[in-house]
């Protein structure tokens, strides 16, 4: 998601939310690597459901940054299997595994995808040119380059888009690999696998959200289900909070540890030896992972968002929703962030402070179950607008100070003889570097008269002479004497030679200077961060975090917050350009009076007289945008066709009279895969489309040729890194595009038409699953039915299944679609593949914690809470994370009553309550007469083991001084009770 450095900022502000992954490694016996036992206990704590945002795996496997890229697509898919298997061995889900691949996105997301893919194509072109330049230079030095190496091009990552042949192959490969694991790994026998590939519309992470909401709607749903989502997107944190599932965590690569790895340059990847390749692959496979615990983040937010002496009842769940909503103003995938806000500048803290003053006055929250309350939103933005001018000035002053500090450090580093104030080092010049000349300026007697070329060509003789070899010394002396011969030149020849020498020296110096400058600029951010860390400066020069992809800070790029070049681009500050980098902030000057009108004139290109009308439209569109984003996170996609039609956001001070706006959306329908490809791909990536569409992107006479510019400007918008710029691409005219594209559908082949469809999710189970016999009997028996509904209690999954859309046949073979890897064909009797439909959610999803929830073990101490409440400075060190171990799952006694018809984990609640109220002398008799659960209808709670269900560590009598803290948060007007008990014998059985 488009919130650069959000994860880094959050983990520094709330350090206990992250903990290291305890990873087991395969054992090698007699040179054979034995696989891990998936069924063994998980050292990280047991997990029910794991969700994989698959684009965060496919991108780094297909075009890795720290190792040579795979040679073929089959090698890419094998790398995907290996990476996925590693993630699964860390998490070890026991009930559900959902693999979600990005499908066709809403139109609001396509604008960002379009900008990314156009820039990706241009970056690939520059990378190929740089690679060819390196190869030419190596050939000039006499190195022989293989023709296969010379002809190789960078793999186009834009192929990771729904509708391409690669995505079709990926879906087939994932279905095969999961079937292979179900058939061969005993630890997977009870695992239910849902695969939502690119033919299912929707972004991967939001498919996962829809699934969780649908499961919560089942009355048999266990409110203590433990969830984990793997992905590199920053918005997964918001999604985890938006589920209101407290037993939720996020698995991701450790970006702090990844900063310690040196990123190889493209030229370093050419002609690597096999040993060097294996070394890089080994280094990449050892990258550590970490957990981000939503339960601990909720604890921090309970302290952060607490407002004493409110005149109405505080609802912690709605306060969390307000916090998530305020974070959207700092950046998201669908709207530009407000100009005055930046995560690195603690803008979220500013919004929280304002929210704490607005809430007591308005006596209502900003949001309710995903719907905006515009009156308090306007009050929030009004107060932010009052601070806006001061924020711009403060930001400018900080930037000037940072630049001055950087210039000082640069001067000290380039000239070590300049005094630094403590010890005068002006006279400390290394004498050994002085040339050996006599007083007349001639070479000293006995010195060798050799040129640089001679030294390079006679390196061997020099080394031997230094070791006492007389023959080598003699050869050097002869060469020196030969160079000492006197040659007579005319005055004109001398004059010309001097001029040529000056020119050559100037060219060489210029070339060297350019290389040095480029090198210093590339190293500048790294050096700054290191020096500031050592000196513990208060000014935090924080490079944007790498969540991704390399951020992708989001989907495909979403795994890479720091994608793109780290070298500041050459920026054009004046004039109107059609390509290259520009910076409109130079002319806007937000820190000077009059910036308001200059902002709209230079960024929106309107005259002063049209600013009021434009401003009104921009404000309305932006309010629609934040309403759409909030609904998207909490209820699902409100409209497939809506999008924000501007490249820039308005000022906070301009949000006036928005409470009367009537905001509504038309649902529409998603694009087909080829329609999205034509919307987001540049002409350079036309190879990923059927051939019939390619002329539409390149033919000058095409009706839609204006959608595919080869050159386009990038506005740096006051930023320094190339990836932070805004690509100023034309917006797609949906009507014109769809009309032109759909006219070509009749010319597609059958195989091409098969990739341009919408499908359902696939469900795969092993032949040992508890539902296998039920599904086989009713779908493939003598009297088959069309649809089977199954509930949550039996297997931890609910929904509807039908026979597989893509002809799954019993008693047949599933052919391995990948060459290499030694993977066999599979018998279809070992597993079952079905089409899966999620339960229908009736009405709106409510923002609350479900009854029957057992809180996890509290992790914060009173000191931790005080640090948040009183804003103490936090000198956090990422190396301390290894000591932070967070218990997983529920702990203690619930304060909720069971709901009628719901999950019956507390079936004996009434009987146990009656037992607790009996006189002491009657209890022994009653206890001896209690019926003990027997047979398959009863199952002991898996939470009654170890410390995960020990009442001594429970809610009411924990030792960290936080007794009763959940009382005020969860005893709210939604009907949740705060009753709880200290009995050690509670919750001993779950009854089916």
Curated annotation (Swiss-Prot):
GO biological process terms on file: DNA-templated transcription termination; mRNA processing; nuclear-transcribed mRNA catabolic process; rRNA processing
Recorded superkingdom: Eukaryota
InterPro entries per the UniProt record, alphabetical: 5_3_exoribonuclease (IPR027073), Xrn1_helical (IPR041412), Xrn1_N (IPR004859), Xrn2/3/4 (IPR017151)
Ranges where the record places region Disordered: 528-568, 916-992
E.C. number(s) listed in UniProt: 3.1.13.-
GO cellular component, one term: nucleus
Compositional bias annotation for Low complexity: 928-962, 969-983
One annotated GO molecular function: 5'-3' RNA exonuclease activity
Sequence ranges of Basic and acidic residues compositional bias: 528-549
Record flagged with keyword Ubl conjugation: no
UniProt feature, compositional bias: Acidic residues: 550-564
Entry's localization field: Nucleus
UniProt keyword annotations, A-Z: Exonuclease, Hydrolase, mRNA processing, Nuclease, Nucleus, rRNA processing, Transcription, Transcription regulation, Transcription termination
UniProt KW Cell membrane keyword: no
Family classification: Belongs to the 5'-3' exonuclease family. XRN2/RAT1 subfamily.
UniProt subunit comment: Interacts with RAI1; the interaction is direct, stabilizes RAT1 protein structure and may stimulate its exoribonuclease activity. The interaction also stimulates RAI1 pyrophosphohydrolase activity, probably by recruiting it to mRNA substrates.
Function statement: Possesses 5'->3' exoribonuclease activity. Required for the processing of nuclear mRNA and rRNA precursors. May promote the termination of transcription by RNA polymerase II. Essential for vegetative cell growth and chromosome segregation.
Protein name as catalogued: 5'-3' exoribonuclease 2
Organism of this sequence: Kluyveromyces lactis (strain ATCC 8585 / CBS 2359 / DSM 70799 / NBRC 1267 / NRRL Y-1140 / WM37) (Yeast)
Gene giving rise to this polypeptide: RAT1
């Amino acid at each position: 998601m488009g919130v650069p450095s959000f994860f880094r900022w959050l983990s520094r502000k709330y350090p206990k939310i992250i903990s290291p992954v305890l990873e087991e490694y395969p054992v090698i016996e007699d040179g054979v690597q034995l696989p891990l036992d998936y069924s063994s206990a998980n050292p990280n704590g047991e997990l029910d459901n794991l969700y994989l945002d698959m684009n965060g795996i496919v991108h780094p496997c297909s075009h890795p940054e720290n190792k040579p890229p795979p040679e073929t697509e089959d090698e890419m898919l094998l790398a995907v299997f290996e990476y996925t298997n590693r993630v699964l061995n860390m998490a070890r889900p026991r009930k559900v595994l959902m693999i979600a691949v990005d499908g066709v996105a809403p139109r609001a997301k396509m604008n960002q995808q379009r900008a990314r893919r156009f820039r990706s194509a241009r970056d690939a072109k520059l990378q190929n040119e740089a690679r060819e330049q390196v190869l030419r230079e190596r050939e000039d030095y006499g190195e022989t380059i293989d023709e296969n190496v010379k002809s190789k091009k960078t793999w186009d990552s834009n192929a990771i888009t729904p509708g391409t042949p690669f995505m079709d192959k990926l879906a087939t490969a994932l279905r095969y690999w999961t079937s292979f694991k179900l058939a061969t790994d005993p630890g997977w026998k009870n695992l239910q696998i849902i695969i939502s590939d690119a033919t299912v519309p929707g972004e991967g992470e939001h498919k996962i959200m829809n699934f969780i909401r649908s499961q919560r709607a089942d009355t048999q749903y266990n409110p203590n289900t433990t969830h984990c989502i793997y992905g590199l997107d920053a918005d997964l944190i918001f999604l985890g909070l938006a589920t209101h599932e407290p037993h939720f965590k996020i698995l991701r690569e450790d970006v702090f540890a990844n900063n310690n790895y040196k990123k190889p340059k493209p030229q370093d990847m050419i002609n690597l030896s096999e040993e060097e390749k294996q070394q890089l692959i080994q280094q990449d496979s050892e990258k550590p992972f970490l957990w981000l615990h939503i339960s601990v983040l909720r604890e921090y937010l309970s302290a952060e968002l607490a407002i004493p002496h409110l005149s109405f009842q505080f609802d912690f769940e709605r306060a969390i929703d307000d916090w998530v909503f305020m974070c959207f103003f700092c950046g998201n995938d669908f709207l530009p962030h407000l100009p005055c806000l930046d995560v690195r500048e603690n803008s979220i803290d500013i919004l929280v402070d304002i929210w704490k003053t607005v809430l007591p006055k308005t006596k209502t929250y900003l949001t309710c179950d995903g719907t905006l309350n515009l009156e308090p939103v306007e009050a929030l933005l009004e107060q932010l607008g009052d601070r806006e001018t001061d924020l711009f000035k403060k930001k400018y002053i900080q930037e000037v100070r940072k630049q001055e500090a950087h210039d000082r450090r640069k001067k000290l580093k380039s000239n070590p003889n300049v005094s630094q104030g403590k010890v005068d080092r002006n006279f400390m010049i290394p004498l050994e570097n002085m040339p050996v000349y006599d007083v007349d300026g001639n070479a000293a007697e006995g010195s060798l008269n050799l040129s640089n070329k001679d030294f390079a060509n006679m390196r061997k003789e020099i080394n031997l002479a230094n070791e006492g070899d007389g023959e080598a010394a003699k050869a050097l002396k002869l060469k020196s004497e030969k160079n000492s011969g006197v040659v007579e030149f005319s005055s004109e020849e001398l004059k010309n030679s001097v001029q040529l020498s000056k020119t050559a020296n100037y060219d060489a110096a210029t070339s060297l200077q350019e290389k040095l400058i480029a090198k210093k600029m590339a190293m500048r951010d790294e050096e700054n961060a290191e020096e500031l860390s050592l000196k513990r400066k208060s000014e935090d020069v924080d490079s944007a975090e790498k969540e991704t992809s390399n951020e992708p800070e989001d989907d495909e790029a979403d795994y890479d917050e720091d994608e793109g070049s780290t070298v500041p681009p050459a920026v054009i500050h004046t004039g109107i350009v059609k390509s290259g980098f520009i910076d409109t902030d130079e002319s806007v000057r937000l820190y000077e009076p009059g910036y308001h009108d200059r902002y709209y004139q230079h960024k929106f290109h309107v005259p002063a007289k049209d600013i009021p009308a434009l401003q009104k439209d921009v404000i309305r569109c932006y309010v629609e945008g934040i309403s759409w984003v909030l609904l998207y996170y909490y209820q699902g996609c409100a409209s497939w066709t809506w999008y924000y039609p501007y490249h820039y956001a308005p000022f906070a001070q301009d949000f006036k009279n928005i409470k009367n706006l009537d905001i509504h959306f038309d649902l529409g329908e998603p694009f087909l895969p080829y329609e999205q490809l034509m919307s987001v791909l540049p002409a350079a990536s036309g190879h990923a489309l059927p051939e019939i569409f390619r002329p539409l992107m390149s033919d000058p006479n095409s009706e839609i040729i204006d959608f595919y510019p080869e050159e386009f400007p990038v506005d740096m918008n006051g930023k320094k890194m190339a990836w932070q710029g805004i690509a100023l691409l034309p917006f797609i005219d949906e009507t014109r595009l769809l009309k032109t594209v759909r006219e070509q559908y009749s010319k597609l082949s059958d195989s091409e038409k098969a990739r341009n469809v919408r499908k359902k999710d696939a469900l795969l189970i092993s032949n040992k699953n508890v539902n296998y016999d039920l599904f086989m009997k009713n779908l493939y028996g003598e009297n088959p039915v069309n649809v089977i509904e199954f509930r949550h209690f039996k297997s931890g999954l609910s929904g509807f299944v039908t026979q597989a859309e893509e002809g799954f046949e019993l008693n047949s073979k599933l052919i391995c679609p990948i060459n290499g890897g030694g993977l066999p064909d599979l018998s279809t009797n070992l597993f079952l593949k079905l089409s899966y439909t999620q339960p229908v959610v009736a009405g709106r999803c409510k923002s609350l914690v479900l009854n029957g929830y057992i809180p996890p073990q509290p992790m914060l101490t009173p000191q931790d809470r005080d640090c948040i409440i009183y804003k103490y400075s936090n000198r956090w060190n990422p190396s301390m994370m290894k000591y932070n171990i967070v218990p997983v799952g529920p702990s203690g006694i619930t304060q909720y009553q069971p709901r009628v018809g719901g999950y019956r984990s507390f079936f004996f609640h009434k009987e146990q309550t009656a037992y607790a109220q009996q006189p002491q002398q009657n209890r022994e008799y009653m206890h001896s007469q209690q019926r003990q659960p027997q047979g398959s209808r009863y199952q002991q709670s898996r939470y009654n083991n170890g410390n995960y269900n020990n009442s001594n560590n429970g809610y009411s009598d924990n030792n960290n001084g936080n007794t009763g803290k959940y009382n005020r948060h969860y005893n709210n007007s939604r009907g949740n009770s705060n009753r709880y008990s200290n009995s050690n014998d509670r919750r001993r059985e779950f009854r089916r």
